[in-house]
C-alpha cells in the first residue's frame, strides 16, 4: 500500500509525458513555435516577437528552407476599421501591421490559448508570494493549455520570460527551448535591499520596518532564487536583451555564455522627425507607463530643483499609459505632487496619449528624461536619441551599460540634485552652444545603429542556426 501512491504518481507523470510529446510526431521536425501569450499587445516585448518571426522567415526564404511557424497566444478578436467583426487571425495580422508596420512574408499557424488559463500569468492576481505563485501556477496552466489541450512544436522560442514553463516543456513535451530573456525575475540586489530594510515599490513599509517579516522575506527570496536557478538549466539557448541582464542571468542560471541580442528599436520611424537645436522648444519630455518603478516623483523633484536655472518657458511633459486603476491613481498623484511643489503650471501630465503625439513631443523637445533604476535595457532612451533630443537617464542597468556609454551621447544621474544639474547644463548647451548639441545628436545616431531591426535580425538568426533544424 505504501508504494501505491508514488507508483500512481509516476504512472500519471509518464502518461502526461507521452501525451504532451505527441507534438514531436504531429509537427515536422523543423517546425518552430513562438510561446507569447500577449502577442497582440503593443509593448516592446511584442515588437521583439514579431520582428523575430519576420527575421526568421526572411532568413529561411534566403536559404531555401521550408518551415512551419506556430504562434501560441491568447485568443483575441476585434473589429476592422469599417466595423466588421474580424476572425482572430485576420485581426492579429492587422494589429501587428498597424502597431509595428510588419507584414510577414510567410503565413503562420496560430494556436489560440484560453484567457481563463493565461490570465494567471499576471502577478496582480496574487496578493502574496507573488513571484512564486505567478511563476509556478501561471507556468503550469500555460503548459497545460499549450501542450496538453493543444500540441507543442519540437522547438519553441519563449520570448516573454516565463521560466517555470521551461522544465515542463523540456521534461514532458520533449521540446528544445530557446529563451529570449528581457530581465531576471529576481536578483541579488533585490534580496540585499530587503535585508537592508529599504522601502521600495516591491518592499512595503510594514515588511521593511518589521525585523521578523524582513527576515522571512529574505528567506523567501533566497529560496525562490534557487528555484529560478534550477528553471534556468533547461533552455538549450539563452539570449538576453542587454549587458545588465546577461550578467545577472549568467550569475543566476550558471549559463556560461548567454548570447547578447539587443532588442529591435524602431529608430527608422523617428529619424525623419528629428529637428535641429534652434527648431527645438524648451521642454523636458518623459515617456513611460505610470508604474511605481518608473519613479515619476523623482522627475518632479528634479525639475523643481532645476527650474530657477532653466529658461522661463521651460516645461516638463510626462507622457505615459495607464494599465489599470492603480496606474491612473499614480498619474493623479503626480499632479497633486506638482501642485504641492508649486510647479503645476510648468508640468503637463498626459495619460494615454496617441503615438503621433508622443513622436511630435519627442521630435521638438530639448531633453528626453528617464528615472527608472536598474532598467534592464531602456528602449525609450534609444527612441529619445533617434528623435534627436539629448537623453538624460538613470545611472544604472542597461541604460549606462549599453546605451549612454559615452558622455558624448547623453547624461546620467541618480539623485534629484544630479538630475537638476544635468537639466540646467543641457538647456545651456541647446541655447548657448547649438553646435555642441548637434554633436550630441550625431554621436547618438552612431551609437543606436546597433539597435536597428536589421542588426537584431542578423544576430538572432545567426544564434539560432545551430538550434533550428533545417
Role assignments for model-derived ranges:
Residues 373:
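Aromatic "clamp/platform" in nucleotide-sugar-dependent glycosyltransferases that forms part
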Residues 104, 331-356:
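Nucleotide-activated donor-binding/catalytic signature segment of Leloir-type glycosyltransferases, i.e.
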Residues 406-417, 425-432:
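Conserved acidic donor-binding segment of nucleotide-sugar-dependent glycosyltransferases
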Amino acid at each position: 500500500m505504501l508504494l501505491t501512491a508514488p507508483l500512481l504518481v509516476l504512472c500519471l507523470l509518464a502518461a502526461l509525458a507521452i501525451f504532451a510529446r505527441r507534438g514531436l510526431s504531429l509537427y515536422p521536425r523543423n517546425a518552430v513555435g513562438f510561446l507569447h501569450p500577449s502577442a497582440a499587445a503593443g509593448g516592446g516585448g511584442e515588437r521583439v516577437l514579431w520582428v523575430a518571426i519576420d527575421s526568421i522567415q526572411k532568413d529561411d526564404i534566403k536559404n531555401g528552407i521550408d518551415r512551419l511557424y506556430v504562434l501560441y497566444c491568447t485568443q483575441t478578436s476585434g473589429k476592422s476599421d469599417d466595423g466588421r467583426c474580424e476572425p482572430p487571425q485576420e485581426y492579429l495580422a492587422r494589429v501587428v501591421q498597424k502597431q509595428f508596420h510588419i507584414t510577414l512574408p510567410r503565413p503562420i499557424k496560430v494556436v489560440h490559448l484560453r484567457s481563463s488559463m493565461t490570465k494567471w500569468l499576471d502577478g496582480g492576481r496574487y496578493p502574496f508570494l507573488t513571484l512564486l505563485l505567478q511563476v509556478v501556477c501561471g507556468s503550469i496552466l500555460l503548459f497545460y493549455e499549450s501542450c496538453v489541450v493543444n500540441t507543442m512544436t519540437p522547438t519553441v522560442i519563449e520570448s516573454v520570460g516565463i521560466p517555470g514553463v521551461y522544465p515542463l516543456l523540456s521534461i514532458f513535451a520533449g521540446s528544445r527551448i530557446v529563451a529570449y530573456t528581457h530581465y531576471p525575475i529576481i536578483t541579488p540586489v533585490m534580496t540585499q535591499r530587503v535585508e537592508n530594510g529599504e522601502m521600495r515599490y516591491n518592499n512595503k513599509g510594514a515588511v521593511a520596518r518589521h525585523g521578523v517579516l524582513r527576515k522571512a522575506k529574505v528567506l523567501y527570496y533566497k529560496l525562490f532564487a534557487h528555484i529560478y536557478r534550477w528553471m534556468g538549466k533547461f533552455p538549450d539557448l539563452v539570449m538576453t536583451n542587454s549587458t545588465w541582464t546577461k550578467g545577472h542571468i549568467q550569475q543566476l542560471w550558471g549559463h556560461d555564455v548567454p548570447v547578447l541580442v539587443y532588442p529591435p528599436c524602431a529608430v527608422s520611424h523617428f529619424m525623419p522627425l528629428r529637428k535641429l537645436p534652434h527648431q527645438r522648444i524648451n521642454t523636458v519630455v518623459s515617456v513611460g507607463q505610470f508604474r511605481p518603478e518608473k519613479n515619476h516623483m523623482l522627475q518632479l523633484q528634479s525639475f523643481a530643483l532645476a527650474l530657477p536655472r532653466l529658461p522661463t518657458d521651460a516645461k516638463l511633459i510626462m507622457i505615459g499609459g495607464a494599465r489599470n486603476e492603480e496606474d491612473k491613481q499614480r498619474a493623479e498623484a503626480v499632479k497633486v505632487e506638482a501642485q504641492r511643489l508649486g510647479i503645476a503650471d510648468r508640468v503637463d501630465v498626459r495619460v494615454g496619449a496617441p503615438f503621433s503625439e508622443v513622436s511630435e513631443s519627442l521630435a521638438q523637445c530639448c531633453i528626453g528624461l528617464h528615472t527608472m533604476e536598474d532598467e534592464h535595457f531602456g528602449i525609450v532612451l534609444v527612441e529619445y536619441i533617434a528623435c534627436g533630443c539629448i537623453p538624460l537617464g538613470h545611472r544604472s542597468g542597461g541604460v549606462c551599460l549599453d546605451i549612454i556609454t559615452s558622455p558624448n551621447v547623453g547624461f546620467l544621474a541618480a539623485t534629484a540634485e544630479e538630475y537638476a544639474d544635468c537639466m540646467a547644463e543641457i538647456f545651456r548647451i541647446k541655447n548657448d552652444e547649438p553646435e555642441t548639441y548637434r554633436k550630441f545628436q550625431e554621436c547618438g545616431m552612431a551609437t543606436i545603429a546597433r539597435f536597428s531591426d536589421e542588426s537584431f535580425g542578423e544576430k538572432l538568426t545567426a544564434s539560432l542556426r545551430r538550434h533550428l533544424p533545417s
